[in-house]
């Protein structure tokens, strides 16, 4: 049952057009490495795409799977969480993350959002690439309707094309706005994953401070503040400070 989920997924055709032939070939090559159990090679190629700015739930899922196969639990959790930021409720990401969470030493009691919030997040949680592609499609339709409006002489059809063009123009602004919101959402980091096997959470942002509790690798903590070298975090309503080198933002 578990192996069914920890498999790479393919990108849909529309998305391959958006990200370019070179990235598409790299993605497929990474998938081939994964299928032949060359997990370190697949991870390197997925990371190359990620570092070049590619954002998609497929990439985050496959990257998380590669790290999981390499026994790097914190990194796997990090990318599953990144994927769920742009695709809330995705079954593969959710299943794999839940399984990884059963392997953690620290159990977190993060409250789940209510249904209406989940529905809103599901709608707004499309990737920036998805909304950018949608904007291009809507812009093309708008231009086409404007051309029809310009060349048509019949009053009835002229009105139809005018109102249709107006509606698609409004829709264009909406998709552009959602693309910006989605990009901001991906960049926003309110939580982080612990990457050290054992991390001391200090009372104050100082190594000479006393330890209030400890966290282990893979734990997800809420970031409530920061200074130059430390994050203030909250875990199960317990606050404290950890050094930035031990925590990576989602």
Residue ranges and their predicted role:
Residues 111-151:
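Membrane-embedded alpha-helical segments of integral membrane proteins
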Residues 159-196, 203-206, 210, 222-224, ...:
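Boundary regions of SH3-family modules and the immediately adjacent low-complexity/disordered segments
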């Amino acid at each position: 049952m578990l192996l069914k989920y920890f498999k790479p997924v393919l990108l849909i055709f529309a998305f391959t057009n958006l990200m370019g032939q070179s990235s598409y070939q790299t993605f497929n090559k990474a998938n081939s490495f994964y299928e032949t159990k060359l997990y370190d090679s697949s991870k390197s190629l997925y990371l190359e795409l990620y570092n070049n700015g590619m954002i998609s739930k497929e990439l985050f899922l496959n990257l998380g799977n590669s790290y999981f196969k390499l026994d790097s639990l914190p990194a796997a959790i990090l990318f599953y969480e990144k994927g769920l930021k742009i695709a809330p409720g995705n079954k593969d990401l959710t299943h794999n993350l839940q399984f990884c969470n059963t392997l953690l030493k620290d159990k977190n009691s993060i409250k789940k959002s209510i249904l209406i919030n989940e529905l809103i997040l599901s709608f707004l949680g499309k990737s920036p690439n998805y909304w950018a592609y949608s904007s291009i499609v809507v812009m093309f339709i708008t231009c086409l309707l404007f051309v029809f409006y310009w060349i048509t002489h019949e009053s009835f059809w002229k009105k139809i094309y005018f109102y249709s063009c107006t509606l698609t123009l409004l829709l264009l602004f909406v998709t552009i706005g959602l693309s910006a919101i989605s990009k901001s959402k991906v960049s926003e980091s309110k939580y982080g994953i612990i990457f050290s096997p054992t991390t001391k959470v200090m009372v104050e942002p100082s190594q000479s401070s006393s330890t209030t509790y400890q966290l282990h690798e893979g734990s997800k903590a809420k970031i409530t503040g920061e200074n130059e070298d430390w994050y203030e975090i909250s875990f199960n309503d317990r606050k404290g400070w950890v050094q930035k080198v031990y925590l990576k933002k989602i």
